[in-house]
Amino acid sequence: MKSTFKEERIKDDSKRRDLFVFVRQTMCIAAMYPFGYYVNGSGVLAVLVRFCDLTYELFNYFVSVHIAGLYICTIYINYGQGDLDFFVNCLIQTIIYLWTIAMKLYFRRFRPGLLNTILSNINDEYETRSAVGFSFVTMAGSYRMSKLWIKTYVYCCYIGTIFWLALPIAYRDRSLPLACWYPFDYTQPGVYEVVFLLQAMGQIQVAASFASSSGLHMVLCVLISGQYDVLFCSLKNVLASSYVLMGANMTELNQLQAEQSAADVEPGQYAYSVEEETPLQELLKVGSSMDFSSAFRLSFVRCIQHHRYIVAALKKIESFYSPIWFVKIGEVTFLMCLVAFVSTKSTAANSFMRMVSLGQYLLLVLYELFIICYFADIVFQNSQRCGEALWRSPWQRHLKDVRSDYMFFMLNSRRQFQLTAGKISNLNVDRFRGTITTAFSFLTLLQKMDARE
């Protein structure tokens, strides 16, 4: 019974599935991905869905553009009046909504082809589990981790931005969540409700857009790290895979396993996967009979093809996200600086909830920068470890036969892959620390300017 349950679990973990369900739904809410993806064909229903999709997209543009425009007008009207706190607060919202508009256009209109290529290639071609050998890993661990991270991040974004909607309700003064200039009296009955609804929609769009752009990057990095885990296990078991294709007997498999176990002593070999052992009896069921040279070449070529697939996917991700992160690093730097400044200026008696909201904004900005840099760093570290995985196989047993192939792979795999911001700055934990340092340097300068006034 226990064995049957384990077999069913392994079979379920090895199934091919859509890896982007939740993040794709979030992009649809943000109008960064078409709802029509879920409707195939060209019938009446498909036409209706496309029409509703376009209407929803245009409405979202209207909401975001009109709020950004109102804030720009507010900055222009109040410029030079000495209220630096209000000016900076308007500048924060202007940056946020301009970035929201830019992300919608970039994902939906500027580069949808590359986005679809990345998602479809990873979904269609990823390896669900490692090659046959003494042990195996599946994509289940990285898939679960990607779902956990993206859901946590998306919910935090929604909570952080929608919290602003609670302020007017708490104050009960018919104020708006976003304090900006309007060319009419928005406090009139009926008008206030419509304006409040539009601002609420705008805040939801901000949350969805920020969560989609950074969240998809995080999911891609976690899944690629999962593919590296699968590759590492396949490389470690490349000789075991060869022996299985040769039709080795139990004695030969036991001897090879003993030598591999002696070499396989490093803990923490995988980023997200849990390694499981394969019973030797199952390896005997394959029933193949090849010579070692042919069997090894077949097993090794599969590993090389998998490595090329991972590198090709990373190049597409870099091409798509590198321009975004080039602008994003500057945007995050200024946002952290401005939000921290406004938080320190909020000292009025009724500003407690506003300080909480600003504190949430600051934490979300830091959280976003962290996931961008941290998961890119994980990918970079994994890209350097292919050679280590290969050395965990008992290579000395067939040194003469495998030496040239091993050396060829080692030389090529040493070229690690680094995700960047505009091909200028590497995305890693050092970039995270450096951006925070720069932001608080600007904060100090801003506070000195405010003190002079």
UniProtKB/Swiss-Prot annotation:
Any single GO molecular-function term of the entry would be: olfactory receptor activity
Name one matching Pfam family: 7tm_6
How does the UniProt record describe the way this protein sits in the membrane?
Multi-pass membrane protein
For whether the record's keyword set contains Cell membrane, the answer is yes
Q: Which domain of life is it from?
A: Eukaryota
Sum up the protein's function in the record's words: Odorant receptor which mediates acceptance or avoidance behavior, depending on its substrates. The odorant receptor repertoire encodes a large collection of odor stimuli that vary widely in identity, intensity, and duration. May form a complex with Orco to form odorant-sensing units, providing sensitive and prolonged odorant signaling and calcium permeability. Involved in the behavioral responses to pentanol, ethyl acetate, and propyl acetate.
Spell out the subunit comment.
Answer: Interacts with Orco. Complexes exist early in the endomembrane system in olfactory sensory neurons (OSNs), coupling these complexes to the conserved ciliary trafficking pathway.
- Protein name (record): Odorant receptor 83a
Q: Which organism is it from?
A: Drosophila melanogaster (Fruit fly)
